[in-house]
Regions:
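C-terminal segment of classical bacterial N-terminal signal peptides
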Residues: 15-24
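Bacterial N-terminal signal peptides that target proteins for export
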Residues: 1-11
Length: 146
């Protein structure tokens, strides 16, 4: 899941200055979905993330009765779509999905910490981590009710 660089043949033909400029341009032109490694990488991250949440005593109570395979599938869809991938999120709105759960701001923050732990484990670069949080962060207003 590390940032991929252009082909070796192209890299060898470029000067260090041009290579630096070209790589920066290529990185900004690729979607976050591509830079995260695509669908299979997102599935792996979601699997680990859900395991982190299940082990997190601060928030695992919110997921105790969850249909875990369905939860994982919806998270993959959500991240895939939100990062520019080909998926379409088919789940309920965040407001509807979290209605009556009494999620507090610190609960949401714990979830974000668990995601960060997973992203660090998979060596996702900080830039992509920040972009992913920027995609998911606005959902907080629909999830946090207390």
């Amino acid at each position: 899941m590390k940032l991929r660089v252009g082909s070796l043949a192209v890299a060898a033909a470029l000067t260090a200055c041009t290579l630096s400029t070209s790589s920066a341009f290529a990185t900004t032109q690729r979607s976050l979905y591509e830079r995260l490694g695509g669908y299979n990488a997102i599935v792996a991250v979601v699997d680990d993330f859900v395991a982190n949440v299940a082990a997190d005593k601060r928030i695992n109570k919110f997921f105790a009765k969850a249909n875990v395979p369905r939860l994982k599938a919806r998270l993959v869809e959500q991240i895939c779509q939100g990062t520019g991938g080909p998926c379409v999120y088919t789940g309920a709105s965040m407001r509807a999905a979290h209605a009556g759960m009494g999620v507090r701001s610190q609960d949401f923050d714990a979830l974000v910490q668990d995601l960060g732990k997973t992203l660090n484990k998979f060596k996702v670069p900080k830039r992509e981590q920040k972009e992913l949080v920027a995609v998911l962060g606005p959902m907080k207003k629909d999830i946090v009710t207390r």
